């Protein structure tokens, strides 16, 4: 984690010194489709769904830094045995900071790569029922996670760009449950 942050700071300092007049604050809205996956000793679960994201950041030229908020689809699991049922639900929200490098191809098309550090809020609810027993459990936890991203932007004007990208996020681990997200999104970035 410290190595990632040190690298991001070093990249941002060197990039700021080389930046051109294309600097400025921006906001970006993305509509995404995500696949949330969980792994634990009991097996694997996945859920696909809509994941909107809102970002605000600063464009230094070929380097951007952005803060974002992502809301993920609720992950549900149903298990039924001979004498019991277990219904689980995981809700997840994420706030993060991304460092993004844009490859300047001297054209409107700009591929990019980046890294992300996030704070993720998990809400986990279990409902266990058997013949003579009923138990519910609710857990709320906040975990840190890391991720990588890649995509391509297309400059419509000097201040407006279309964006299409992929993100992988390791969202954290709680009570033996690892949560990962694979996201594909499209959006619009407006620079001020």
Q: Predicted segments — roles?
A:
Residues 29-33, 67-71, 113-119, 152, ...:
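Transmembrane beta-barrel strands of outer-membrane/channel proteins
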Residues 23-25, 46-52, 59-61, 91-95, ...:
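Residues that define the transmembrane beta-barrel architecture of outer-membrane proteins
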Residues 55-130, 184-192:
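Gram-negative (and chloroplast) outer-membrane scaffold detector with strong preference
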Residues 19-24, 104-110, 156-159:
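Short loop/turn motifs that connect adjacent beta-strands in outer-membrane beta-barrel proteins
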Residues 1-24:
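Cleavable N-terminal export/targeting peptides
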Residues 26-28, 154, 180-192:
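Outer-membrane beta-barrel "beta-signal"
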Residues 18-63, 189-191:
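Short glycine/proline- and aromatic-enriched beta-strand/turn motifs that initiate or cap beta-hairpins
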Residues 37-47, 75-85, 123-134, 142, ...:
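Outer-membrane beta-barrel translocator domains and adjoining extracellular loop/strand segments
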């Amino acid at each position: 984690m410290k190595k990632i942050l040190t690298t991001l700071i070093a990249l941002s300092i060197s990039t700021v010194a080389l930046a051109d007049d294309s600097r400025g604050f921006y906001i970006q809205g993305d509509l995404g489709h995500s696949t949330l996956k969980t792994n634990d000793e009991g097996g694997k679960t996945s859920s696909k769904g809509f994941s909107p994201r809102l970002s605000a950041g600063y464009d230094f030229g070929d380097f951007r830094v952005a803060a974002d908020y992502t809301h993920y689809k609720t992950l549900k699991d149903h298990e039924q045995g001979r004498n019991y049922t277990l219904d689980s639900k995981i809700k997840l929200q994420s706030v993060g900071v991304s460092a993004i490098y844009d490859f300047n191809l001297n054209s409107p098309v700009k591929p990019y790569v980046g890294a992300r550090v996030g704070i993720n809020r998990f809400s986990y609810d279990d409902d266990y029922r058997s013949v003579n027993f009923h138990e519910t459990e609710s857990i709320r936890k906040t975990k840190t996670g890391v991720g990588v991203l890649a995509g391509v932007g297309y400059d419509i004007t000097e201040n407006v760009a279309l964006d299409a990208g992929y993100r992988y996020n390791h969202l954290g681990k709680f009570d033996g449950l690892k949560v990962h997200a694979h996201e594909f999104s499209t959006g619009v970035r407006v620079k001020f």
